[in-house]
């Protein structure tokens, strides 16, 4: 479902190459020589390098020499185990069997060394991720009732000769399991060796079993589906198909805590609607701003994990209050998951649901802003999101301007623009995660132009509409072995938005790209978010509805 929506949404997105050309903030920042040059210190990826004062000091020195003006340090990773001295949150003590220094305070070290070097330091927290599938001990496991409740479909494959096997949906295949893909199947991930597949028609008849490996492009027949399996599961598929038996699918809806699902992502999300969760997250932000001289707070994963959450009783009550009536059929009035894996069937309350979830996130961000600014008004508030705005409703977020409307999107609820939260942030980092720096290069390579940093940056500006500063953000791993393309991607971010955020430090270090950064940032400059009065000027001077 999400892959199809992604392509549909993206195809509607990048239609105007000059989307950011009329940005008032871009022009002001150029005139004043302001540019966000931000590097992210991921907690887990850089654990060894940053687990001592010496390592931090050396890294900060290199950042200063590369003319970086802002460091974002991850102090509450997705595990919910923090890397500062907290009286509220549990501390990280080890990772992958490696002990973390008991009395070491990463945030204190980065703030001290960063400020010595004249670099602003912003503390990042993974807001609604409070646990990791690979590391126990996070608050999500201690407080199971905090976890998001995910709407699942328990499926099994049955045969006309009386056999039945449990079934995984897409995103596999898993060792020893059968997976099913619906009629909208396309490229299916990296398949393991000895993978067998059969195409099943609408009447249950199966094609001859065949083997496939690697990245396969498989299409299910109209009204039918594809079954895949490897090892024993693949052998069972072949044997059953060869026998002439027919396949059918059976299923029933199920509600599960996210830690109990087959979620391939590591993060265990807690419910953004839960008042106890909100109070806990706000207390962490309050603690950081009160105890540390941070220049900013950055909110990562301030969202739902996917479209299938949250279906808890807590959320149901709040949703019914939001729409002013009881939901007669839960969850089908919102949407129904199909028997054959594929797109959801939207119910009569689907658009209300999208607006409700986005409003929950906007309202929470308003609380965050009020909390942080009441302690220290000068602390900047940043947000990290994906740049694929037209499909970001999937995770319950509208990071655009409250004046940005896109009714041509078939999912867009009436008044959805009111849930946009760009006006509540001091800056937004949008992940422009594409391997092609420019539209032209994407087209030259036979790809659609939206698969470019340039297009993603322009659409980010289009959605935010100068409501706040926008920094195009790069995933450096996508440029491994291509420093020239990395440099061009940085230039696109600097040209189309008000700066560039680099994710992550570990790749700059591993690829030894400090010299590339010096090329991209030849002279020191200040960041736009260090001049917040520019936002007031931009917002107050903009015509209504612009």
Where are each of the predicted segments found?
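Substrate-binding cleft of secreted/luminal carbohydrate-active enzymes
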Residues: 415-545
């Amino acid at each position: 479902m999400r892959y199809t929506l992604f392509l549909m949404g993206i195809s509607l997105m990048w239609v105007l190459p000059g989307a950011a050309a009329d940005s008032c903030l871009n022009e002001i920042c150029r005139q004043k020589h302001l540019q966000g040059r931000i590097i992210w210190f991921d907690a887990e990826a850089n654990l060894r390098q940053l687990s001592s004062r010496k390592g931090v000091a050396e890294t900060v020195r290199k950042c200063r020499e590369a003319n970086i003006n802002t460091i974002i340090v991850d102090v509450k990773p997705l595990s919910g185990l923090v890397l500062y001295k907290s009286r509220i949150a549990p501390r990280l003590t080890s990772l992958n069997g490696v002990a973390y220094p008991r009395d070491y305070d990463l945030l204190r070290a980065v703030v001290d060394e960063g400020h010595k070097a004249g670099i602003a330091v912003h503390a990042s927290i993974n807001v609604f991720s409070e646990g990791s599938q690979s590391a126990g001990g996070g608050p999500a496991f201690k407080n199971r009732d905090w976890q998001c409740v995910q709407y699942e479909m328990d499926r099994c494959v049955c045969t006309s000769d009386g056999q039945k096997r449990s079934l995984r949906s897409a995103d596999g295949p898993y060792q020893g399991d059968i997976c099913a893909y619906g009629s909208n199947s396309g490229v299916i991930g990296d398949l393991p060796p000895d993978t067998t597949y059969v195409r099943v028609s609408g009447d249950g008849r199966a094609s001859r079993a065949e083997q496939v490996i690697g990245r396969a492009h498989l299409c299910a027949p109209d009204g039918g589906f594809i079954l895949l399996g490897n090892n024993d599961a693949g052998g069972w598929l072949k044997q059953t198909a060869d026998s002439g038996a027919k396949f059918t699918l059976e299923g029933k809806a199920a509600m599960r805590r996210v830690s109990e699902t087959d979620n391939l992502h590591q993060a265990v999300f807690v419910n953004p609607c839960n008042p106890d969760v909100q109070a806990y997250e706000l207390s962490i932000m309050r603690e950081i701003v009160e105890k540390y001289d941070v220049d900013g707070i950055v909110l990562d994963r301030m969202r739902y994990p996917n479209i299938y959450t949250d279906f808890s009783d807590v959320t149901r009550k709040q949703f019914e209050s939001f729409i002013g009536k009881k939901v007669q059929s839960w969850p089908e009035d919102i949407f129904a998951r199909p028997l054959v894996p594929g797109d959801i069937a939207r119910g009569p309350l689907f658009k209300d649901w999208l607006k409700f979830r986005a409003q929950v996130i906007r309202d929470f961000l308003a609380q965050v802003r009020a909390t942080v600014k009441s302690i220290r008004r000068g602390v900047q508030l940043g947000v990290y999101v994906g740049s694929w705005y037209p499909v970001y409703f999937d995770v319950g977020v509208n990071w655009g301007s409250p004046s940005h409307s896109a009714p041509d999107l078939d999912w867009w609820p009436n008044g959805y623009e009111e849930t946009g939260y760009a006006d509540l942030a001091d800056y937004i980092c949008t992940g422009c995660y594409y391997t092609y720096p420019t539209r032209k290069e994407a087209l030259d390579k036979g790809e659609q132009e939206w698969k470019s940093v340039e297009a993603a940056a322009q659409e980010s500006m289009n959605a935010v509409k100068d409501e706040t500063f926008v920094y195009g953000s790069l995933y450096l791993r996508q440029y491994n072995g291509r420093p020239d393309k990395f440099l061009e991607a940085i230039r696109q971010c600097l040209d189309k938005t008000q700066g560039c955020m680099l994710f992550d430090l570990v790749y700059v270090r591993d690829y030894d790209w400090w010299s590339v950064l010096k090329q991209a940032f030849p002279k020191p400059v200040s960041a736009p978010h260090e001049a917040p009065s520019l936002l007031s000027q931009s917002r107050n001077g903009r015509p209504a509805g612009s």
